Amino acid sequence: MNNNLFEGSDDDGEDLQLSTNKDYAKTYNILRKKELLQKYKDRGLDVSESEFDSDSSSSEEDEVDPKFDQDFFKTLSSLKSKDPCIYDKGTKFFSESSGDEDDKDGEAPKKKKKAKPVTLKDYERKVILEHNGKFESSDEEQQEKEHEELQRAQSPSAVEEERRLKAEFRKVMNKEDDSEDEEFGGIFKKRSKTKEQTAAEEADFAKWLAGKQAEIQETDKKQLEPLKQYWSSNKLTQGESFLRDYILNKGYANTDESAIPTYDEIVGEAAPLSEDEQELEKQAEFEHKYNFRFEEPDADFIKRYPRTIEQSLRRTDDKRKEKRKELKERKDQEKQQKMKELELVKEMKRKEIDEKIRKLKAVTGNDELGFRDEELEEDFDPAAHDRRMQELFDDEYYNVDEGEEKPECPSDIDELVLEDWDNYDPRQHANGGGEDYEGHCEDDDFNMDCDYDPSTAKEQLQQELIENTRGRKGRKGRRNRFMEMIQAEKPAFNPEDEKTYSEYIDEYYQMDCEDIIGDQPCRFKYVETTPNDFGLTIEEILLAKNKELNQWASLKKAVQNRPEHVEKKEQRLYKMKAKNEDLKRKIFKSLYGEGSDDEEQPAEEKPEVTPAEATAPAENGQVSTEGLSKSKRKRLKRKAAAAAASAPKVLKEESDSKDPKEADGSTEDVQAESSKKKVDTPSKKGKDDANQETKNSPQSTEKTKNNNALKNNKKEPKNVQNGFQKPQNQANKSAKTKSNQPFKTTESAPAKAEKSNGNNPFNKPQSKSQQRQELPPIHKNQGGNKKGPRNANGTNPFKKSNQKPSAPFPAKKTNNFKAKNKQNNNSGITDDRLKAYGINPRKFHKREKYGKKDN
C-alpha cells in the first residue's frame, strides 16, 4: 500500500480507532460531549458549546469538493478518450490537497493542511504536559518576558535584520489566512466566491458536459472536451445516460440534511407538508381522478389529430393506396403518350398544309397567295373580295415573265415515246428529215448489214410484233384494260369536293384538346348563337340607361341560351316592336330629351292668382296646370288625347236621341272638335313656350269655343232626359265668356275637368287593353283613308256619322266597341304582333267579333 495515503495525519498509531457502526459512534460522541461539558461546568470553567462540536471532518463523510470533482472529470475524460497517460505509473490524477482551490501558482509555498480543531481532551492533555495541570495566566506572562529577553540578547545585525524583514515581507505577501479566528491575516487576500456564484458555475459546467451549453469559461476545457463529446452523443446508451445524470446532478450527495430551506419553503406554498397533510392531498387527488375518470384530460384544450399519423406502432396496410397510386401513374403515362401521339399527328397535319400552301405559292407565283394574314382574319366582304381579285388577276398578272425555260428531256425520251405501240406511227417518229432519210453511219441505230432494207424492215418489224401479240393473250388483255382506262372519261375537277383553306385550319386546331377522359379527347366547344339586337341600334344601346334597356328587354332574356327557333322568333318580334316610335319615346326618355318620370323636376314658380280667378276655371270645368310638374302635364295631355278619341261614342248616342237638325249641328261641332284635337294633339317633343304662343293666338280662342260646345253636347243627353234642352247659343255665349277670362289653362285642362266631374255619365275610365289597342304603330303602315283626322287607332272616328248624317227615326243602339273596330277585321294583325305589345290575341279577337260587354 502506498504510504502517501497516511501522510496527512498527525496522530499517532495509538490514537487511531476503528468504528464499525457510524450511528452508534455518533450517538456515543454526543453523549460523551454532554457528560464532559457538564463536568467542566461543575468545575467553574468557562467553556463554550462550540468547542464540543463533533469532529465532522473525521467522523463524518467529507464534504463535496469542487476541486475533487474537476480531477474526477479529467480522469474520466482520459479514460473515455483512452489517453496514453493513463498507462503511465507516475501520473497522478488526484492531488494530495484536493480541498485547496488555490494550488495553481508554483511560486507560492506548499500550503499546510488545515489545522485540526482542538478538543477539550486535547487541551487538558496539553495543560498537563506543559504546565503540570495548572491553569494560571501568570505563567504565560512570565514566559513572554523570558522570550523577549532571549530575543533581545540574540539581536541580529543590520544586514541580517534587513534580510529577515524582506523574507518576512515576501512570506506575508504569499501567505493566505486559512484560520478565520486569527485577528490579523495577510495584507492581500483573494476574494472568495459566493455560494450563488459557485453554484452557477457548477451548473454551467454540468450543462456544458451534458451538451446543453455551447461555451464555458474554463481553463481545462480542452482536457474535458472528449468527455463532453461522449456524453452529448445521441448514441449514448440508457445506462450511460443515467450515470451521466447521476454524476452531474450529484445524486450521491446527501443534501436533505444539510440543505437550508428558503423562506417560501418555510412559510409559503412551497412549505413542506406534514404526513397528515400529504395523506389528505393523496386522498383528494384520488377522489378527483375517480370522479372525472370518464372525462378526457385537458378538456379545455382543443385537440387536433393529424389525418395520417407518421410515427405509429400499428402496422400500416396501404396496399389499396399503392394500387390506386400505381393506377393513377399508369393513367398519367397513357395520357402523356396519347398527347404525344396527338402532337405528332398535329405536326404531320401542319406539314401537309404547309406543303399544299407551298404548291399553291409555286403555281400562283405569289408568296402571299393573293391574301395577307390580316385579310384572312377579317370578316368576309364580297365587294372587297371582288376588288382584291381584280387587283391580283389583272392583265399584268398574266404578262409577268415567270422565267420558265424549256425543260431538258432525258436521253431516252425517244425510247419512251416508242413504247406506246398502240398509237405508233412510223412516219411521225422517223429519224431525221422524213421517209427519204436512209440513215448515217454515225447514227446510234445505224444497221451495218448490207442486206438491210429500211422499207421492208419496218413492215417485217410490224408483222413480227403482231405475231408476238397473238401468241400472248395475257398482254393483249392487259393492253385492252389499259386502253379502257385511257379512253375512259375522266371526272372534271369540282372545287366543292375539295376542302377549303379554313377547313384545313379547323382540322388542324381541332386536334388540340384540353383533356383526355378514357380514350376520348375532350375539347371546349363554342355554341353558335343567333345575333339579336332587340330592335335597337348601337347608339341607342350605348346611350340609353340600364333601367330603360331592362324595361325594353330584360337582361335575363338577353343572356340566356335558348334554341335557335326561339331566338329567331324574338328577333322578328323585336323588329316589329322597334317600328313603334311612340313606344320608344315612352321607354327611352333619356334619348329623346324628355327625362324620366322618376327624376325630380325643379319646382316652377306659381303665379299669384286671386280668389276670383282661381274659382273661375273650376266653374268652367277646367283645371290649371301651370303649377304642375312637366311629367304630370304630359300625362294630362295623353289623357286629353284619349278623351278626344272616345268622343265619337258620345256623339253617336247623342245623334240617336236628337232630331236630324240637331244631329247635324252636333256632328259639325264634333267634327270641328275632332279636327282641333287632331291638329293640336300634344306631341312629345313640344315645349311650354310653344303652348304659350298657341294660347295667345286667335286659333286658341276658337279652340276654347269648340271645347265649350263639346261639353254642352256631352251634357245635353242628361238635360233631354230631364225634359228640357239647353239652347246652343247660350253654350256659345258661356264659352265666349270663359275664353275671355284672364286665367289661362293648357290643352289638357278639359280632360282633367272631365275626370274630376262626377256628373258626366260618358266619362268612363279606359281599360288597359283598350289603351294598348289604341297604340298607333299597329296601323302605322296601312294605306288608304289618309286624308282627314284619325284617332289613336288610325281610323276615322267620324266615318260613321258622315255616312248617316240624318236619321228619320232614332237609330238602334249598337255596340260602340264593335263598330269602332270594324275596320280592323281585315287589317291582318298577327298574334305575334299582338303579343309583342302585351295584348292577349284571343281576347282581342273576341272583342272585335262580339264587342265589349256592357255592364
Swiss-Prot record:
GO biological process entries: endonucleolytic cleavage in ITS1 to separate SSU-rRNA from 5.8S rRNA and LSU-rRNA from tricistronic rRNA transcript (SSU-rRNA, 5.8S rRNA, LSU-rRNA)
Stretches the record annotates as Disordered: 47-67, 82-117, 130-196, 312-342, 424-453, 589-855
Compositional bias of kind Basic residues: 630-640, 842-855
Bias type Polar residues, positions: 720-748, 756-773, 792-805
Residue ranges with Low complexity bias: 609-619, 812-826
Composition bias type Basic and acidic residues, residue spans: 82-91, 160-176, 650-664, 674-692
Family the entry assigns: Belongs to the KRI1 family.
Protein name: Protein KRI1 homolog
Origin organism lineage: Eukaryota, Metazoa, Ecdysozoa, Arthropoda, Hexapoda
